[in-house]
A protein has these predicted regions:
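Extracytoplasmic soluble-region selector
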Residues: 1-45, 61-62
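Disulfide-bonded cysteine-rich modules in secreted/extracellular proteins
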Residues: 41-56
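A cross-family detector of function-defining hotspots
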Residues: 54-170
Length: 170
C-alpha cells in the first residue's frame, strides 16, 4: 500500500520498511511488481505490540517473547534486553482487568537516542510533541491505534507502545 511506498512518474519512492505491490496500468495492459523496502536499522526486536488490548495470559506472552524473563508480578512481566544497550522490555496489564495487556515499554541506554529514533522513523510516522517526546503512529489499518512514544527525559531512552494517547503518559 501507499504506507510502504508510492509510484509516480515511473519512480517508486520508499516510505517505510515493508513489502507492497506496485501496479502500473496503461491502454495496452497492466504490470505488477512487488517492492520490498529493507531497513537500514535493526536496532532491536520489537515486542509483541499486536497483543495490546487483548485478553492474554502471562504464559501466552512467554510463548511469543523470546527474551529472558527477569521479573513477573500480577500486573507486569519484564524481560532482559537481547542486546547490551537494551535495559528492559516490560509488558503491563490493565489494573482494572488483569488479563488485558495494556502497554509495553522498552528501555535503552541514553546513548542510543538517534539509533532508536531512526529505527522507529523507518517503520512509523513520527509526530514530534516537544523536545523530549515524539509519537510514532503506524499507517496500517489493523494497527491504526498503536502508538509509540519515545522519550529522553530520563537517563535512558524509553519507548512505550499502547493503543491511544490516553493510555500513554507523557
Amino acid at each position: 500500500g501507499t504506507e510502504i511506498g508510492c509510484f509516480a512518474d515511473g519512480t517508486v519512492t520508499a516510505r517505510h520498511v515493508g513489502t507492497t505491490t506496485v501496479t502500473a496500468t496503461a491502454d495496452s495492459g497492466s504490470a505488477a511488481c512487488t517492492v520490498e523496502v529493507q531497513p537500514r536499522y535493526n536496532t532491536f526486536v520489537e515486542p509483541a505490540y499486536e497483543l495490546i488490548g487483548q485478553t492474554i495470559s502471562h504464559a501466552e506472552i512467554d510463548a511469543v517473547e523470546k527474551r529472558e524473563k527477569i521479573e513477573e508480578t500480577k500486573f507486569s512481566i519484564a524481560y532482559k534486553g537481547e542486546l547490551p544497550y537494551i535495559k528492559r522490555v516490560e509488558y503491563f496489564y490493565d489494573v482494572a482487568d488483569e488479563d488485558e495487556l495494556n502497554a509495553i515499554t522498552v528501555r535503552f541506554d541514553k546513548g542510543y537516542e538517534s539509533e532508536v529514533k531512526n529505527f522507529l522513523s523507518e517503520r512509523y510516522l513520527p509526530v514530534p510533541i516537544n523536545a523530549y517526546v515524539i509519537n510514532f503512529y503506524t499507517h496500517y489499518e489493523t494497527l491504526a491505534a498503536v502508538k509509540v512514544v519515545w522519550s529522553n527525559r530520563e537517563k535512558e531512552v524509553v519507548l512505550q507502545y499502547g493503543h491511544n494517547p490516553k493510555q500513554i503518559k507523557q
